[in-house]
Amino acid sequence: MGVKTFTHSSSSHSQEMLGKLNMLRNDGHFCDITIRVQDKIFRAHKVVLAACSDFFRTKLVGQTEDENKNVLDLHHVTVTGFIPLLEYAYTATLSINTENIIDVLAAASYMQMFSVASTCSEFMKSSILWNTPNSQPEKSLDAGQENSSNCNFTSRDGSISPVSSECSAVERTIPVCRESRRKRKSYIVMSPESPVKCSTQTSSPQVLNSSASYAENRSQPVDSSLAFPWTFPFGIDRRIQPEKAKQAENTRTLELPGPSEAGRRVADYVTCESTKPTLPLGTEEDVRVKVERLSDEEVHEEVSQPVSASQSSLSDQQTVPGSEPVQEDLLISPQSSSIGSVDEGVTEGLPTLQSTSSTNAHADDDDRLENVQYPYQLYIAPSTSSTERPSPNGPDRPFQCPTCGVRFTRIQNLKQHMLIHSGIKPFQCDCCGKKFTRAYSLKMHRLKHEVIS
């Protein structure tokens, strides 16, 4: 009769062994090593520590039975981070919270307990750790099939969520696109699925509820007109609108936006950082020039150099009683090729600030001015005169005529002055056909025809 073999496999044997070893440690029996962390003593067994940590295995294997070697100092570990790891070695249960997770992660990395370190990293990346007690219930993750050991996570409200030590992929939170301080604006999207509010008042990261809707929104094509670039010539956005127009548009947007429209705006807003051009520091030095409005006194003083059509319209708009002075920061590149490029960047942004009456009266004049090409290069040089008062924003008169060397504080004045050297007279009277260099002269000439008629 053959020999019969019976094999018994106990699933609870490992847990019972760990429990008994933990009892021996708590009672102080058979403890052969002392761990000192921040002047606090912990008794443990070498075999358990060496089996759990490669750091302790390297330290303890091959040592002689010397009394002084039984005390091991851990200088780069805190008590708050070491106690959960010691409990994990004897119970296979890791208890962490928002207060000690940083210390536990640092201690696990130092002690070469990489499975625990990856678990802490997954907790920090997940949204479970940083949710408030008033938020939705935390999702519990299923235990891994290969590793049956579980990690208990203690949240702020005291609930424990079992998570496998392997910490499978947790649903990632969608990062919120944060604009720069100069471009930071209030952006509100009303959606029935997941309302999101991104504004300057919110400092905590917002989480979108539905990841499927986010993927669907990302798959939609992005409108090139809405995905605005971050920098414009001379700091002027060509889609800038008056304050009243912006308020009216925001009111219409918040009333009843469609689902597709809201989803498209979320996709455009999230992708704004990806479209941001990154330039190395020091590639191009920009000269910052603040354009101030012309007061009534300055207009009378500069009769010898009247303003152009665009600036006269801007001055008329700004001198209306009750209107606020409009100021714009211009970034003038020293590498600008010609005045024509400068004129395109400025004149395309200025008509949005003009009044309705001035736009209708001088629309033809603006078209003539935009079609003029100036064969002169813009020369911006620092002031060399010792008598001029230094300015914190740069030279007081950064714009210099390349023909006669006269300096101006405003680029519009330089363009008007250069028309004299070029001999171009783009402004023509509709009644008599007489041509003028400046729009102001044409405007005064038209008054004569109006008086005669």
Curated annotation (Swiss-Prot):
GO terms for molecular function: DNA binding; zinc ion binding. A zinc finger (C2H2-type) spans 399-421, 427-449. The keyword Transcription regulation applies. InterPro entries: BTB/POZ_dom, SKP1/BTB/POZ_sf, Znf_C2H2_sf, Znf_C2H2_type, ZnFinger_BTB_dom_contain. Residues 135-157, 241-266, 295-324, 336-366 are annotated as: Disordered. Residues 304-318 have a biased composition (Low complexity). GO terms for cellular component: nucleus. The modification Phosphothreonine is found at residue 200. It is found in: Nucleus. This is Zinc finger and BTB domain-containing protein 44. It comes from Mus musculus. The gene is Zbtb44.
